[in-house]
């Protein structure tokens, strides 16, 4: 009886070890699948962004610049226009293509101020088109935003971004 018990325990031990070894392979496979899924998601972001911008360009109220930046004038202002190194004060809401808000000075209740040469290229270009008092919607392709790196955990690599921007004030660089 003891001999049968020892053999049964040895068999269970061997089966347990074999299943643990199999779990390591499964973990490796899971990691490879996650990396593969991330690559697909990154590629999909780029594809979805390009498809969105191509369709968006058909809208009569959307203007596309040579760089690929698109914008829509919601309200035209009459004040000063910023240069590439001027500091601007704005209210803005940034969204992903699915409508998820990732940042908003409007929600914080306080406008943001920054030099235009310290932001993403889509902002530097887009805000120079605006006059104080303007309200534009900017459609920024990933290469004019955060590109293949993304930003934080909300803006994935290759994400096209949409910003509603109100230009409140321009402080000219001296």
What is each of the regions a protein language model found here?
Residues 2-174:
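Cross-family detector of peptidyl-prolyl cis-trans isomerase
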